[in-house]
Amino acid sequence: MAVKIRLKRMGSKKSPFYRIVVADSRSPRDGRFIETVGTYNPLKDPAEVVLKEDLVLDWLSKGAQPSDTVRNILSKEGVMKKHHEAKNVKK
């Protein structure tokens, strides 16, 4: 099962609000998901991001692939850097 971390669109017409979710890559964009790991509101200035960092790092370490947009969000929040540092630590 290929697992992705991606955005699930919420909110009403013309006012999008997104949940950052972990989902099977075969399920639809707004369909079934495994776990919610954060939210993203692009309408606020600056965009509001709330992440459960420990859950995101856990899923990344298990092999979940972030979508391009989520990868950019995680990079801005510093999560990708922490993931790469944790991955490169010698055991």
Curated annotation (Swiss-Prot):
Belongs to the bacterial ribosomal protein bS16 family. The keyword NAD does not apply. It comes from Enterococcus faecalis (strain ATCC 700802 / V583). InterPro entries: Ribosomal_bS16, Ribosomal_bS16_dom_sf. Keywords: Ribonucleoprotein, Ribosomal protein. Signal peptide: none annotated. This is Small ribosomal subunit protein bS16. GO terms for molecular function: structural constituent of ribosome.
